[in-house]
Amino acid sequence: MALTVKEEEFSNTLIKNASAFDRLKLGNLKNLKIQKKLQFLYLILFVLITGVFFFFLIGNFYSHRKLYQVIKNTKHTTIGFKIDRPHDKVLSSVLKNKLSTYVKESFKFFKSGYAQKGYLGSENDSIELDDVANLMFYGEGQIGTNKQPFMFIFDTGSANLWVPSVNCDSIGCSTKHLYDASASKSYEKDGTKVEISYGSGTVRGYFSKDVISLGDLSLPYKFIEVTDADDLEPIYSGSEFDGILGLGWKDLSIGSIDPVVVELKKQNKIDNALFTFYLPVHDKHVGYLTIGGIESDFYEGPLTYEKLNHDLYWQIDLDIHFGKYVMQKANAVVDSGTSTITAPTSFLNKFFRDMNVIKVPFLPLYVTTCDNDDLPTLEFHSRNNKYTLEPEFYMDPLSDIDPALCMLYILPVDIDDNTFILGDPFMRKYFTVFDYEKESVGFAVAKNL
């Protein structure tokens, strides 16, 4: 029997089916159109991201350029310095030790109501809050005719200048710039033994005299050569500074020595016995110390002065308002060495509980939600003026932990029952003048350069 196979029977039914073939072509066309639309969207997204990036770069460039021009054109000696922020180290440690979940879950737990409402820490917490409150302004200076370089902490809370000596055999001194008296022709021997104590420990050594240089200013000055810094460990070894340049008052000094700025004025090296701090809003890791005059381009609006109420510290009288909580005639210390606003514990705990602020157990972190509308503008009233500090200046998002959570730069510190410290958050909003001759502190709103 003959078997006949027709061509149309052999052909693929999909090809034979014209409607199916048409649908296939239509589908390909649709996919092509979708791909083109996606490519177009990707292009738009790329342009937007690139535009935002370049806008940021240009804005940052012009911001730094404005600041550079101010510093370049100022008539007064201005020294840039780095700021070592302890909260950065805490957050870095949290991330390094994978404690992000612990922070988030601690906040949820204490907010849930299953535990003590508004947990604010206990005596069992292992990290001292005083440590995280410490702030360091690092700036360069030189000693001797051969300009031996040192990195100083500019500290308004102390009044002596010290550097480590080549005769220092402490562990921390092994990594520091060491002062060598034999290398300087302007060195004058004193040799009087001395020790000076700080909250973190005591240093020991002896007095010497040599030429101190800060920027384009220089003067013969009596300082301490430190030979023993063991009590400062482990802070000293783990920090960048070599020594401390005290910017406090003579009566606070060991040896009754005039502060560097006062001595510069006595020797007619500067016009006024004052110094100022400008902390840029856009960069929390740098600042500028100006000696001998006031650079008006660092601030805007009026510059107002508050009379000191103490002969040892830059301390003034203020009525302080944390929302409904008020401390009348509080002592307010303006301090470059404090990273936060501090307040007496009993006062601050009431405020924190009302504001739904929680302390993370065993960590020096006080946190709340970033959208916490209960947080008020802090107010500081003098007899004639009012200074304010909005939440944006005293809180920051914990972006790498939980973007919904913010930490507060307000800490409980008990100097006594009515003393507050106005540290970095306050000085970042307000350009600050420390005036020895007027025995006053001046404030003006800092420009965002």
From Swiss-Prot:
Primary localisation category: membrane
UniProt KW keywords: Aspartyl protease, Disulfide bond, Hydrolase, Membrane, Protease, Signal-anchor, Transmembrane, Transmembrane helix, Vacuole, Zymogen
Subcellular location: Membrane; Vacuole lumen
Residues of the active site: 155, 335
Topology Cytoplasmic: residue spans: 1-37
Disulfide bonds: 168-173, 370-406
Keyword presence, Ubl conjugation: no
GO molecular function, one term: aspartic-type endopeptidase activity
GO cellular component: food vacuole; lysosome; membrane; vacuolar lumen
Catalytic activity: Hydrolysis of the bonds linking certain hydrophobic residues in hemoglobin or globin. Also cleaves small molecules substrates such as Ala-Leu-Glu-Arg-Thr-Phe-|-Phe(NO2)-Ser-Phe-Pro-Thr
PTM note: Proteolytically cleaved into the soluble active mature form by cysteine proteases in the digestive vacuole of trophozoites. Proteolysis requires an acidic environment. Autoprocessing or transprocessing by other plasmepsins such as PMII may serve as an alternate activation system.
Record-linked InterPro entries: Aspartic_peptidase_A1, Aspartic_peptidase_AS, Pepsin-like_dom, PEPTIDASE_A1, Peptidase_aspartic_dom_sf
EC number of this enzyme: 3.4.23.39
Protein name in UniProt: Plasmepsin IV
Protein's organism: Plasmodium falciparum (isolate 3D7)
Gene: PMIV
